[in-house]
């Protein structure tokens, strides 16, 4: 997978705008402010390429990034943020739900969860729904550099239990240190083989 040659392709606000090139797609989902953009920038080794915002709700469409001729990375709007209108939240939910359930090019949804917080109902609902839809899912616990070793193990175990995740089914990730990047690339590449 060539992540050195990455370009922003387009922002999609309706299913009729989806690219039709047939490249494999990997979607990145997570609650607002869990470190989704930072994770994507670390993955690409390009600081600031995917816009990072301290303001939740910044991503408002499905943002497609093309990695050479290999695949697409799709940045989904963050969920669970209350400062946008209910109508906007509903529109995002419909768009994301339709995209995930209908898109044949979608190979895996990377679900990003902040390890510092207790299990959230919205994360569990998304994980359960993806499993029901038979969509491959890769949970990633971010911001691991913010916890000590003992805290990290305890928080990971709590999230695993709360979300029905086995230890070998998820990745611990730090955008600050890059830990987990190689594991993430290996999993994504396994879908391209």
From Swiss-Prot:
InterPro entries noted in UniProt: G_ENGB_dom (IPR030393), GTP-bd (IPR006073), GTP-bd_ribosome_bio_YsxC (IPR019987), P-loop_NTPase (IPR027417)
Function: Necessary for normal cell division and for the maintenance of normal septation.
GO molecular function (one): metal ion binding
GO annotations of cellular component type: cytosol
Keywords from the UniProt entry: Cell cycle, Cell division, GTP-binding, Magnesium, Metal-binding, Nucleotide-binding, Septation
Organism: Desulfotalea psychrophila (strain LSv54 / DSM 12343)
Name of this chain's protein: Probable GTP-binding protein EngB
Organism domain of life: Bacteria
Family: Belongs to the TRAFAC class TrmE-Era-EngA-EngB-Septin-like GTPase superfamily. EngB GTPase family.
Residues annotated to bind GTP: 30-37, 57-61, 75-78, 142-145, 173-175
Domain EngB-type G as annotated: residue spans: 22-193
GO biological process: division septum assembly
Keyword Metal-binding part of the UniProt annotation: yes
Annotated binding of Mg(2+), by residue: 37, 59
SUPFAM superfamilies linked to this entry: P-loop containing nucleoside triphosphate hydrolases
Cofactor: Mg(2+)
NCBIfam families: GTPase_YsxC
């Amino acid at each position: 997978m060539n992540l050195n040659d990455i370009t922003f392709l387009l922002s999609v606000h309706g299913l009729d705008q989806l690219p039709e090139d047939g490249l494999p797609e990997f979607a990145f989902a997570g609650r607002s402010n869990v470190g989704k953009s930072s994770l994507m920038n670390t993955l690409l080794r390009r600081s600031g390429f995917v816009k990072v915002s301290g303001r939740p709700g910044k991503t408002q469409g499905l943002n497609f990034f093309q990695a050479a001729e290999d695949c697409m990375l799709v940045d989904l709007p963050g969920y669970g943020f209350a400062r946008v209108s209910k109508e906007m939240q509903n529109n995002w939910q419909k768009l994301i739900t339709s995209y995930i359930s209908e898109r044949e090019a979608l190979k895996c949804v990377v679900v990003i969860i902040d390890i510092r917080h207790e299990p959230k109902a919205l994360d569990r609902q998304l994980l359960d729904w993806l499993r029901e839809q038979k969509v491959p899912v890769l949970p990633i616990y971010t911001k691991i550099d913010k916890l000590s070793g003992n805290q990290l193990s305890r928080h990971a175990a709590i999230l695993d239990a709360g979300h029905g995740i086995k230890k070998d089914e998820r990745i611990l990730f730090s955008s600050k240190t890059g830990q987990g990047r190689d594991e993430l690339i290996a999993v994504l590449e396994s879908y391209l083989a």
